[in-house]
Amino acid sequence: MATTTTILRTDEAWNGEKLPDYLIGKPEIVINKALIPPKTNLPWHHHDLMSYAYVIRGEFYIVLKNEAKEKHFKAGDVLCETVGSIHRGENRSDAECELVVFYPSKKDMPLSVPHPECEESK
């Protein structure tokens, strides 16, 4: 017998921020597989759209730039990303982390906006 289990149903990002209204415009769904090598920090960035991820294997942290806030995620976890907050992912472990990231976007919208000016102050 087939079953369905809801693994995430929320109106908040992982840090408790309320999600914005959906974007207006021609829809485009993007699904990416992300591989984060061991001991790797991703660049600082933010998203202007909602995104969701499922951790297939490994573990990582999401760290907010302007707040002393971070959260740990591991294989089997799901998360709803922040919108508009500068953050980065950090794989502090000795193993690769694999995620599938879902972006309900609109045509030609960037999935993330880099903040290279933040790299100096890490």
Q: Can you name each region flagged by the protein language model?
A:
Residues 69, 83-109:
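Ligand-binding loop in jelly-roll beta-barrel domains
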Residues 47-67, 77:
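Glycine- and acidic-residue-biased ligand/ion/polar-headgroup-sensing regions
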Residues 36, 66-84:
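Short acidic-glycine-tyrosine-enriched beta hairpin
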Residues 1-33, 72, 79, 115-122:
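A short, N-terminal "cap"/entry segment at the start of jelly-roll beta-barrel domains
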Residues 24-27, 39-52:
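A short beta-loop-beta micro-motif enriched in histidine and acidic residues
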Residues 31, 50, 84:
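Short coil/loop residues immediately preceding or within conserved phosphate-binding loops
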Residues 62-64, 87, 109-113:
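Substrate-binding/catalytic groove segments of enzymes
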